[in-house]
Amino acid sequence: MAKDIKFSADARAAMVRGVDMLADTVKVTLGPKGRNVVLEKAFGSPLITNDGVTIAKEIELEDHFENMGAKLVSEVASKTNDIAGDGTTTATVLTQAIVHEGLKNVTAGANPIGIRRGIETATATAVEALKAIAQPVSGKEAIAQVAAVSSRSEKVGEYISEAMERVGNDGVITIEESRGMETELEVVEGMQFDRGYLSQYMVTDNEKMVADLENPFILITDKKVSNIQDILPLLEEVLKTNRPLLIIADDVDGEALPTLVLNKIRGTFNVVAVKAPGFGDRRKAMLEDIAILTGGTVITEDLGLELKDATMTALGQAAKITVDKDSTVIVEGSGSSEAIANRIALIKSQLETTTSDFDREKLQERLAKLAGGVAVIKVGAPTETALKEMKLRIEDALNATRAAVEEGIVAGGGTALITVIEKVAALELEGDDATGRNIVLRALEEPVRQIALNAGYEGSVVIDKLKNSPAGTGFNAATGEWVDMIKTGIIDPVKVTRSALQNAASVASLILTTEAVVANKPEPATPAPAMPAGMDPGMMGGF
């Protein structure tokens, strides 16, 4: 395929046009009085959102050179979202500011490499200064404040703080669509996995269609149970204890399933069979998690174990197990605290080394199931469009809250970025390095300027007053008042703020040091084939 190539000023100018188109679309959403953006969808109703990364991912420009600029800013938003889960709009605003200020100086003859060096030095100083002024987040009320600021809803803040209190900071908090109009919180204590009973005849409560097992034994295997003779000796031993049994296996079929069901119906003993969760290697890991949680052993060929040789010592135990048609919940497994702690440490070490987003998500789920439980925030809204918008806001709020707990908080509304200006300005740099520092100094003001602008105030006036205000005092754009930001609950997680700045500086520096851009040449449209001579157009069906 033929290529189009642009050089130096032309290349940078084309990319900056793309940067501006994306950034100008995203930045209208910043702050408490930010507006919404409507996104057309190929199917269904349009999506109305103020989530920066969602908007950025939707933007595709016709001009290839402009589109490359837009995609680089979209990458800033995505990367910030991956690391901190929020702050994507701030990252976009900072990127645009650094690119614009930098381009002025490069056009005037400054060396882009020197500018890049200055930007990197200034950014590192700003990040260290942010960490130095961060305050730790502890307590339900502080967590609720962080979530409320991100979601613009005190109610959502309460749900998230309640969920984190119930399942712990490492706990799984999932966000689902509710069937009703109200948003509600549901907490499932213990380990839950998405496999239900293999036969409805195994239920103990016909009204709720669930099987409740009190103080059960648990048989855990990655094998298929087809022949009842394989587990008959074990069943006879369990029968003597007069306690129920849960079988977790690759599958239970053949003669084994009807035999178990028949004994259950006759009241011989209470047994429930479910399929093992997950697939492949992930299934083995999850079965091992269940075994450690319940104090049992996975009966697997990997360990040289056979079902027919299994004894009571291989069975796990729990205080209670509830099984419905879709899921199984194990409460208060009998595994040793030390073994569970070691397993949690192993999963955390795997989390640190994995590079796959999918693997990271699954490891976090496993960690949470071992560490405490699962909280589900069920989002309700009057319409599907409102539901999608609310769900995105709650996801952002949850991510921001986790980030706040991890690294602490700083004054929100862009105030913290203004606070660190003094430290960055004190850097003793010369030449183009000093120019790079000055570019960052100007960019640090931009989030406050945009928040004020979106709220109908003059940004420059707000910034001047902010620079001369006591530490911690900032501008509440929602009310137009000057307040103590942290006491008022206007806060940002330091992880969100620093990630936004670091990612913006990194990509903006790359754009400024770009000297050539190569794009695919658009292919000319292929003309439609000519109609054979003598063919009646009516034969084409009238199209």
From Swiss-Prot:
Keyword Iron set for record: no
Chief location bin: cytoplasm
PANTHER family: 60 KDA HEAT SHOCK PROTEIN, MITOCHONDRIAL
A biological process from GO: protein refolding
InterPro entries for the chain: Chaperonin_Cpn60_CS, Cpn60/GroEL, Cpn60/GroEL/TCP-1, GroEL-like_apical_dom_sf, GROEL-like_equatorial_sf, TCP-1-like_intermed_sf
Localization: Cytoplasm
Domain of life (superkingdom): Bacteria
Residues the entry annotates as binding ATP: 29-32, 86-90, 413, 476-478, 492
Assembly mode: Forms a cylinder of 14 subunits composed of two heptameric rings stacked back-to-back. Interacts with the co-chaperonin GroES.
GO function terms (MF aspect): ATP binding; ATP-dependent protein folding chaperone; isomerase activity; unfolded protein binding
Recorded catalytic activity of this chain's protein: ATP + H2O + a folded polypeptide = ADP + phosphate + an unfolded polypeptide
Family matches, as CDD domains: GroEL (cd03344)
Protein name: Chaperonin GroEL
Family: Belongs to the chaperonin (HSP60) family.
Function: Together with its co-chaperonin GroES, plays an essential role in assisting protein folding. The GroEL-GroES system forms a nano-cage that allows encapsulation of the non-native substrate proteins and provides a physical environment optimized to promote and accelerate protein folding.
